A protein has these predicted regions:
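Active-site and adjacent substrate-binding regions of carbohydrate-active enzymes
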Residues: 1-409
Length: 409
């Protein structure tokens, strides 16, 4: 499309992208990839015009004002849905449209198009999930669920980005308050919708939605080496971020599986995979999955030089040591522990469907909360401190009920 658009401005693809004679429009839009892009506009020597891009210059933005572009996107969705996929992660949904005099984020036109997508999905593919990737504050993201009264008419799910850095912050500060405060500020969502919560993903651990002081603190604690940083975040995997500390990894995973929302695990974190900060940009955390100690970590039978990214050769995180095969053969492995925790979550509907109520705790290092759905009531207590901690909880409401330990047997 882009090659045709740049060659023939008056052709069928001429206005599939956003073109301009200069780079002066949309000056209120921030630059997202501050490490690599000096502008949201790039000059094309073929068409001799500038094209608009919110991310890399090799990722020109489609022109959603063009109804033919909308139809093309709907056709692409239908193609994959007809093949039987379960849903879509809708990347960067706040940036579909640009409008002069705005920051070009969260515009009404974006929501209008998402409603159209949702209507198409509901009409012909009713079991499909639309997951919004909107790196914004919860009060802005909640709009991507759509109309509250109707139960939601845009996306079924949306990532909750600000929770992630605050879990890391809470552990280093040994205080529940970073997590408690962001959850308290999270607005209610439509009844048929759900947050998607995560610890890490294929991008950097974003620090956009923290204060400058908090960002400096996170860099000092988790990314002392400048190579560990990218854009406004940290490009490391979960295990290296936590110094491969099994207790901390278990705490983070237990929080992921018990906080409100649907947990989204990043591949390899279940076996404690590492990263490669010598690779460029976001590739540090995108190395091949480590299945076995064999050639290419069992990921591919091709010549190693043909892999899109090299396997990790680190003595601690290298595929010869850290892999699924080795984890499966060890009953005490992180993989088996994670599977047991997921099974516990599945056995208790309160985690997936229940309400969330934080309980007052006498110890700031301890967060305690209830998950409740119908007759299923679960008390979760997490310790952010490095050491064992006492705490007092007021559980008089449950006098006469008998607690059953879910994990310890």
């Amino acid at each position: 499309w882009f090659q045709e658009s740049r060659k023939d401005p008056t052709g069928p693809y001429g206005d599939y992208y956003v073109w301009a004679d200069d780079d002066k429009q949309y000056e209120d839009a921030r630059i997202i990839f501050v490490d690599t892009e000096a502008s949201n506009w790039t000059f094309d020597p073929v068409r001799k015009q500038y094209y608009w891009h919110r991310f890399f210059s090799h990722q020109p933005d489609l022109n959603y004002e063009n109804l033919r572009v909308q139809e093309e996107i709907l056709a692409a969705l239908r193609f994959w849905l007809d093949l039987g996929i379960d849903g879509f992660r809708l990347d960067a949904v706040p940036y579909l449209y640009a409008e002069e005099g705005t920051n070009c984020e969260n515009l009404p036109a974006s929501h209008a198009f998402l409603k159209r997508v949702r209507a198409e999905v509901d009409a012909h593919y009713p079991d499909t999930v639309l997951l919004a990737e909107a790196n914004q504050w919860p009060e802005d993201v909640v709009d991507y669920f759509g109309d509250y009264a109707s139960g939601g008419d845009e996306c079924h799910m949306a990532f909750h980005f600000p929770v992630m850095p605050r879990i890391f912050m809470a552990v280093r500060r040994e205080s529940r308050y970073p997590v408690s405060e962001i959850l308290a500020k999270t607005p209610a969502i439509p009844s048929s919708c759900q947050w998607g919560i995560f610890l890490r993903n294929h991008d950097e651990l974003t620090l956009e939605m923290v204060t400058d002081e908090e960002r400096d603190y996170m860099y000092a604690e988790y990314a002392k080496d400048p190579r560990m940083r990218a854009n406004i975040g940290i490009r490391r995997r979960l295990a290296p971020l936590l110094d491969n500390d099994r207790n901390q990894i278990e705490l983070f995973t237990a929080l992921l599986l018990s906080l409100p929302g649907s947990p989204i695990l990043y591949y390899g974190d279940e076996i404690g995979m590492g990263d490669n900060i010598w690779l460029g940009d976001r590739d540090a955390v995108r190395t091949p999955m480590q299945w076995t100690p064999d050639r290419n970590a069992g990921f591919s039978s091709c010549d190693p030089g043909r892999l899109s990214l090299p396997t990790i050769m680190d003595p601690v995180y290298g595929y010869q040591v850290t892999n699924v095969e080795a984890s499966m053969s060890s009953p005490s492995s992180l993989l088996h522990w994670t599977r047991r925790m997921i099974e516990i979550r599945k056995q208790n509907e309160a985690f997936g469907l229940g309400s969330y109520t934080e309980l007052p705790s006498s110890n700031p290092a301890v967060i305690a909360f209830l998950r409740e759905y119908k007759d299923d009531l679960v008390l979760c207590v997490h310790n952010f401190s490095r050491f064992a901690q006492p705490t007092e909880l007021d559980l008089q409401t449950f006098d006469g009920r008998h607690p059953v330990e879910l994990i310890g047997g």
